[in-house]
């Protein structure tokens, strides 16, 4: 993700108002915990963890968690929250384009509302990294934006199916796919 986008997330995560919509785990993620436990998953990465809503949730359910984000303010908040709750998280400021893990490290990888921030090439590199660190037969849970989304085509086109909304220099691209 571009440095300016990371700066924008740092600004957002630094305030309670900016974090407010990102504190509760998404039900689709929370609902997968029984499946992960049944499959024997123990060590999970949350790529683009933001303020840690999913990373903290997984830690509360006994998983060893790798919380990864480009924005330091989100990681700082997740670190404070983990300490306040008596939870352990491994927090890393890193880019999903080059994950700091060995091949086939995880039974499950989460990337919620993150990997579509960029062009098709960016998304492809992130998906390649996810597949690299995912064990054979492992599960990937993530989100993408659809061309059927009402936001598709809004903003300034910077690449095929990729748009930046708004004129803020810190705005980041959104890639839409079929």
PLM regions with names:
Residues 1-41, 51-98, 122, 139-178:
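Class I (Rossmann-like) S-adenosyl-L-methionine-dependent methyltransferase catalytic domain
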Residues 47:
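Conserved beta-strand/loop positions that form the S-adenosyl-L-methionine
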Residues 97-109:
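A short acidic, Gly/Pro-enriched loop at the edge of an enzyme's catalytic core
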Residues 108-122:
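A short SAM/SAH-binding and catalytic strip from SAM-dependent methyltransferases
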Residues 124-136:
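A short glycine-rich, Lys/Arg-flanked "PGG" loop and its adjoining helix->strand segment in the class I
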């Amino acid at each position: 993700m571009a440095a300016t986008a990371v700066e924008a997330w740092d600004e957002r995560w630094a305030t309670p108002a900016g974090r407010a919509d990102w504190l509760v785990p998404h039900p689709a993620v929370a609902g997968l915990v029984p499946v992960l436990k049944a499959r024997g998953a123990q060590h999970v990465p949350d790529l683009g963890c933001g303020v840690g809503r999913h990373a903290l949730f997984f830690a509360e359910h006994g998983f060893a968690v790798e919380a990864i984000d480009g924005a330091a303010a989100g990681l700082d908040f997740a670190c404070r929250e983990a300490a306040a709750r008596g939870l352990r998280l491994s927090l890393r400021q890193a880019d999903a384009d080059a994950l700091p893990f060995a091949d086939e490290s995880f039974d499950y990888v989460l990337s919620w509302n993150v990997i579509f921030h960029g062009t098709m090439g960016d998304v492809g590199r992130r998906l390649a990294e996810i597949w690299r660190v995912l064990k054979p037969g492992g599960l990937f849970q993530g989100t993408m934006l659809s061309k059927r989304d009402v936001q598709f085509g809004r903003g300034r086109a910077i690449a095929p199916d990729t748009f930046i909304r708004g004129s803020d220099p810190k705005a980041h691209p959104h890639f839409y796919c079929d």
